[in-house]
Amino acid sequence: MESKDQNVYRKGSDNFSKGSNTFFGNLKSISTTTTTTTTTANTDQQVSKVAENNEIDDNSSVDSSSSNPSSSSTSTTPVKPKTFVDGALRGVWSIGVGVVNGAKGIVEQPYLGAKNNGLGGFVKGVAKGVSGVVILPAVGVLEFFSYTTQGIYNTPITVLDAMKSSPKEEEMITVSAEIPTIFFAVELEESFKTAKEKGIPHLLKVCIEFISRRKNIEGIFRISGSKFLIDEIQSKFDKGLITSVEDLDPNWIYEVACIFKSYFRYLPHSVIPDEQITEFYRIQNNITDATEKAAALKAVVNSIPNFQYTILYECISLLHDISLNSKENLMTPSNLSIVYGPSLLRPNIEKGDIQEIANANTIVFNLISFFQQIFIKNPDPSILEIEHPITPIKPMIQK
């Protein structure tokens, strides 16, 4: 059943279409009226009657050259253009009809005038024929804009009608929603335990290896991938169907990047323990000296339990490597921190605390920018089984 607003909208659409059709029907009748008084009266009567009933046909005008001008014309209620394209096509057709009828009138009207009233009728016929050449194409152009506008106006109604036959929400439940997930919205350690029991690599391992091979792709982590593909890939991950980078299409970089960042966003709890998150915010709010801040961040990072530290290490390491390719991928530490700050530091977004969100982004910015100075402890290779080349630790930044 339609709502009151929908009924009002539909009624407004009907009135707009009928009003436009009546106006243009009357306008076209000016240039197609015959020279005889009787015919003029009949034509005006037809137009008046049809206009009164809002039944002027869009694709026909009252033809004064009919063999029986006194008979009333038959008109049908025009079908409204349903979409912009439909309206535009009708408008183009109307322009063509106007040009043809105008050209026809400049020959036909003088002939009929001369036949009925001699020289005087011929002169009047020429005048009406010329007016038809001007008016009918002009009306066609105006109708083009009218039909197009009607199409735009009626598009929401077309969508509403289509929605009536669409499947209800309960009918669109995907299979993945009925199967217990392995990774998404599952506690971090539990997902690792489940993956190990099933003998499959963790989603993070596959995503990190996949993205690491494509670090120079422009807009990585910023450009959204295909929603359809993201849902499909996520479902396959949660069913244990993706076990290596070979199971992923090389062109799915934006989709896989989206899945990687979404994984951290939808963890029930951040990969960083609450105690360390609190310390991170304290450092950001109280320490302004760059060297002191880096040293304080390093101390907090290295106090994170080994399991969470390894996951955080792998994540920040990947982001750091991507930032080193920012000339190609346009993803600087600042851009990356905006993407990952809220997921890793969990600021109170619902309350709209802008300063807390900014602080979260700044903390992640520092973790990415000074990764090698802050993450001095090696990760546990048995957790994600990702091998890293040994890189020298750079000295702490100096003021």
Curated annotation (Swiss-Prot):
Ranges where the Rho-GAP domain occurs: 186-375
Regions that span the bilayer: none
Site residues (Arginine finger), renumbered to this chain: R222
Keyword tags: Cytoplasm, GTPase activation
Biased composition (Basic and acidic residues): 1-13
Biased composition regions of type Polar residues, renumbered to the chain: 14-31
Keyword presence, Cell cycle: no
Biased composition (Low complexity): 61-79
GO molecular function, one term: GTPase activator activity
The keyword Ligase appears for this protein: no
One GO CC term on file: cytoplasm
Source species, domain of life: Eukaryota
Region listing for Disordered, in residue ranges: 1-80
One Pfam family of this chain: RhoGAP
Compartments where located: Cytoplasm
BP GO annotations: small GTPase-mediated signal transduction
Role description: Rho GTPase-activating protein involved in the signal transduction pathway.
Protein name as annotated: Rho GTPase-activating protein gacC
Organism: Dictyostelium discoideum
